[in-house]
Amino acid sequence: MQYTHGGDIYTYGEMIDFSVNINPLGPSKKVIEAAKRALLQSAAYPDCKCRKLREKLADRLRVDERMFAFGNGAAELLYTLVLAEKSKKALLPIPSFSEYEQALKTVGCEIKYYQTKKNNGFCIDYDFLEELTEDVDIIFLCS
């Protein structure tokens, strides 16, 4: 799998890219106003524990505050997970988000690929279960 990252307007120019979590309409007025207010705090380092966000989400969703992991995007969290788990063998359906493979390679994890098929809508089929051997200790599944 070739490494690429979505949202690369510097290579491909302006485009609507659904592979990244970016609003093609741009930020809302509420977000722009919040960003302006945040500029007043730009001399201070952000709260690396995200205490206010953690507290509000836990309260709203009625779950324990320890249930959250925050990062600067999905890719950072994937790398954090892979570095923490230090998996030895992964099962990775392809085609898929390239960051899964890249993160696994950073820890020298052996990757066993499961090729999905176009004629099956790139869905995982029953034969996937045959690939689930005891030595596989991490799997990435996505839609």
Sequence positions of predicted segments:
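N-terminal "arm"/small-domain region of PLP-dependent enzymes with the aminotransferase-like
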Residues: M1-A44, F140-L141
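Short, well-ordered alpha-helices that flank and scaffold nucleotide-derived cofactor binding pockets
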Residues: E33, R37, D59, Y79, ...
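Short loop-beta-helix segment that forms the pyridoxal 5′-phosphate
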Residues: P46, A58-T80
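Short, structured coil segments at secondary-structure junctions
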Residues: D64, V107-G108
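Conserved PLP-anchoring active-site segment centered on the Schiff-base-forming lysine
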Residues: A84-L104
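Short beta->alpha connector loops at strand-helix junctions that form conserved
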Residues: I94, Y113-K118
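Active-site phosphate-binding strand-loop segment of PLP-dependent enzymes
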Residues: K118-S143
